[in-house]
Regions:
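Rossmann-like dinucleotide-binding cores of NAD(P)H-dependent redox enzymes
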Residues: 54-94, 171-217, 274
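Short loop/edge segments at beta-strand edges and connector loops
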Residues: 84, 100-103, 141-143, 215-217, ...
Length: 293
């Protein structure tokens, strides 16, 4: 509702476009294989079934949801967890076969012989290899920290002042932890698009909880003491921390789409695997592809 797109909805591509997007069954159903059980993959599988295509969904982990699992734990984003629950109920009601703990390869796709392969391979946290100590025991990505994959101590430094970093800082402050936020740029949430209402609310919350924010500071090292940071052209100093949470962006996961070139399979890449974006991008990508099969 905030990107000058006219009236729209992040999770309902048909909103205000009902006459354009009809729900008629496909005249020629196609066998669809969806690889990736995040929001884009779940939407693709759901709509494929709705349009009458036989579809199966494959997910490499033991649970569906992808980035929704971590996002649903962030302050002001509890509705994301509810969205994940809703998708899984939809998939169950539509009786879509779901294959968990299954890492799909190009050879597996070729052997399955679908008419359509939807690659919703998602994205992973950027962990800059150039930073000494990035693999230190105290270092953890924001996604792993929020989803509970790794424990987080009582004193936390969050590196990265984008929307996810700010929400991560608030998440742990609300748990009673002592948190500091570090951002390389002169202001937080200044690069990616964040709706003004949400940005202002987050800034107010950070200020209300008196979270120290070190703008124009770069992470130099993660060590036994915590995070070594430095302002421009000044001496570095250490912020002591039990855990250093790194939130400096996402990168699309590797794709095997090129290995399917030359087959008769229609191949589409959707969601964060095609371009790192948000729920709106993932859902609308999936819907557009399935609608036009």
């Amino acid at each position: 509702m905030y990107k000058r797109l006219g009236p729209t909805c992040a999770v309902n591509p048909r909103a205000m476009r009902e006459s354009e997007y009809t729900l008629e069954k496909a005249v020629e159903p196609k066998k669809v294989m969806v690889i990736g059980g995040g929001v884009a993959g779940m939407e693709a599988a759901r709509m494929a079934a709705k349009f009458g295509h036989p579809v199966e969904l494959y997910e490499k982990s033991d649970v569906l949801g992808g980035e929704l699992l971590a996002a649903g734990n962030r302050p002001l984003k509890t509705e994301v967890a509810e969205l994940n629950d809703w998708y899984q109920l939809e998939l169950k009601e539509l009786r879509i076969p779901i294959h968990l703990n299954t890492t799909v390869t190009a050879d597996m796709v070729k052997a399955a012989k679908p008419d359509v392969a939807i690659l919703a391979l998602g994205a992973s946290s950027v962990m800059p290899r150039s930073i000494p100590g990035i693999d230190h025991a105290k270092s953890v990505s924001a996604i792993d920290a929020l989803s509970g994959k790794k424990p987080v101590g009582d004193t936390v430094v969050v590196v990265g002042g984008g929307e996810i970093g700010c929400e991560t800082a608030m998440h742990f402050v609300l748990q009673g932890k002592k948190v500091a936020l570090v951002e390389a740029l002169p202001d937080i949430m200044s690069v990616e698009f964040v709706p003004n209402q949400h940005k202002n609310m987050l800034k107010d919350m950070l200020e209300h909880h008196k979270i120290p924010i070190y703008t124009s500071h770069r992470l130099m090292e993660i060590n036994d003491e915590g995070a070594l940071i430095a302002p421009a052209e000044e001496e570095a100093f250490t912020l002591k921390a039990d855990t250093v949470v790194v939130s400096v962006g996402m990168r699309a996961n590797p794709s095997f789409a090129s290995e399917l070139v030359g087959t008769e399979i229609e191949v589409y890449e959707i969601g964060a695997g095609r371009r790192v974006g948000n729920i709106y991008n993932a859902v609308h990508d999936a819907y557009e592809i399935i609608y036009n099969l």
